[in-house]
Regions:
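Enriched for short, Lys/Arg-rich terminal
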Residues: 2-17, 21-29, 58-65, 69-87
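A short, surface-exposed loop/turn module that caps and links secondary-structure elements
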Residues: 32-58
Length: 87
């Protein structure tokens, strides 16, 4: 079953930055994985902890992460951020 993706305003802006940085194809690969199964491994994902508990993260590259929330009952993935968490 295909999962629906919803993008936050920040994630939409991040996608433009990633395209400009030459990371669009890697990001699209990860988004396709999320559409198929957001808990598929590989590629590996991390469950976030602390204030971000309930969220998941996947590496786009060494610096950038795709951060998302899963709504199992709705088969929905909220894509929250896709840019560096170091800024």
């Amino acid at each position: 079953m295909t999962w629906q993706l919803e993008f936050s305003k920040a994630a939409t802006k991040d996608l433009k930055k990633l395209a400009a940085a030459g990371l669009k194809s890697k990001t699209q690969e990860l988004l396709n994985v999320l559409r198929g199964n957001p808990l598929q491994n590989p590629p590996p994902y991390e469950k976030l902890i602390g204030e971000l508990a309930g969220l998941y993260s996947r590496r786009i590259n060494r610096q950038h992460r795709l951060v998302y929330r899963i709504h199992e009952d709705e088969k929905l993935v909220d894509v929250l951020r896709m840019w560096t968490h170091y800024e």
